[in-house]
Amino acid sequence: ASTSEVYGDPLVHPQPETYWGNVNPIGPRGCYDEAKRFAEAMTMAYHREHKVETRIVRIFNTYGPRMRINDGRVVPAFVSQALTNKPITIFGKGTQTRSFCYVSDLVDGLVRLGKSDERFPVNLGNPVELKISEFAERIQRLMGTNSPISYKPLPSDDPKQRQPDISKAARVQIGRAHV
């Protein structure tokens, strides 16, 4: 499995699979982003050289049960902070966007991709984009918390927008998010 991180801080929005990305190879996020890009390149090379069936899925922000609280992802961080009445921490101004996909929708897409004939990368995720500040407010409302929102500096290389173009997934009948 690959990731939307292969797009880096994208200059194209939403991100189609044909977009090569905007990754800073020596930036703080570079190791992860480039490792996923390298894995895609090796997968395609192996497919071409050895005629092995392969699939590449670029997974966008996924959430669901059993997420680790301290893994650095925004969903468990916000929920944990809201449950403990700690400030909900937003990095930057909260204008950066993400598209959140429930894990059951992702699994459905993975199964469909596995059964398809598609050999090139496919984006899997929810095409509905949400500002991080709006997401924090939604968590406050759903959790019924008094947790204030706190703002901290945006880490360098943090993507400003993240939204999958899922037209290819729809075209090859892999599906889209329902939850």
Regions found by a protein language model. Give the residues of each.
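Catalytic helix-loop patch of NAD(P)-dependent Rossmann-fold dehydrogenases
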Residues: E5-I56, R68-D71
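C-terminal substrate-binding subdomain of Rossmann-fold SDR/epimerase-dehydratase oxidoreductases
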Residues: P16, N61, P76, S80-R176
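Active-site proximal helix/loop that lines the substrate pocket
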Residues: T3-G8, N61-M67, T95, E129
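Hydrophobic structural elements of the Rossmann-like NAD(P)H-binding subdomain
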Residues: A1-S2, V57, F78
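Acidic pyrophosphate-coordinating catalytic loop
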Residues: M67-R68, P159
